[in-house]
Each structure stands twice: as structure tokens, then as C-alpha cells.
Amino acid sequence: MKLTSPKQRQGDYYETLAKGYLEAQGLTFFDKNWHYKNLGELDLVMLEPTQKPPCLVIVEVRQRKASQFGTSLDSITPAKQRKIIKTTAAFLQAHPQFDTFDIRFDVVSYEGAVIAGKAVTPMPTWIKDAFSVN
């Protein structure tokens, strides 16, 4: 995928950071930016293989430079949650090997601006089970 806009490059940067962070926590990477037609996109699809039964972890990655409009977690509205859940249903239809897996929806968020010219790695906040299918 060609990243043309600054927003796309920023999103890719934080998704890559989140992927590395989650792998360091024991999750296994499966896919990034999985999308289905006009339905939506899943930022990261990870596996938690040590859990019994194994767990498919759908990860929404968020970042906000400033919090005057709320935190990055606040931006995951009920409508956004429904979109992620519907996209996950399409993902499961395309990947029947995960039919027996538990499904979990996590969020990895980053707050604050990147400091230009500084080698600063933002610290993630990882919320397991951030929302559920209900």
C-alpha cells in the first residue's frame, strides 16, 4: 500500500509501533490494515496463542496530538465499534480457520505530539477487551 498523505504515514508509524509492542507482550502478528470493500479496515489482527482456546485479537490503534477534543480512546465511538465488529465478521468469513478462536477487541493508544528531531518513542496504553459484541 502506498502511503501518500501525512495522515496515512502517521497511521502506519503508530500501527508499526503498536505491532512491535504487542509482539513484545507475546502476541503473534497475523495481518495489518485488512479491509473489506467499503465496510471498513482492521488496523492490526493479532493472535494470542497461549490462551486456551486461542484468541484472535482485533486491535484498533489510535493517536492524538492534543486532548482538547478528548483522548484517542474517546474517538472510538459506538458507531466506530460497530464498524470494527462488522469488518471483523467479514474477516472471519474470509478466514474460516479462526472459527473456533475467541475474539477480543483491544485498543492501543498513543497520546501527545511527536517531538521533531528527537528520538522519542511514544509509550502506548494497551486496553484489553476495550469493547465487546453486544
Region roles according to the model:
Residues 35, 47-49, 110-112:
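A generic structural motif
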Residues 37-40:
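Short acidic/glycine-enriched loop/turn segments that link adjacent beta-strands
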Residues 94-134:
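Domain-level recognition of nuclease-like catalytic cores that cleave nucleotide substrates
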Residues 22, 42-48, 52-65, 84:
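Conserved catalytic cores of phosphodiester-cleaving nucleases, focusing on short active-site segments
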Residues 85-97:
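Metal-dependent nuclease catalytic cores in nucleic-acid-processing enzymes
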Residues 1-33:
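Acidic-basic catalytic patches of nuclease active cores, encompassing PD-(D/E)XK
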Residues 64-88:
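Mg2+/Mn2+-dependent nuclease catalytic core
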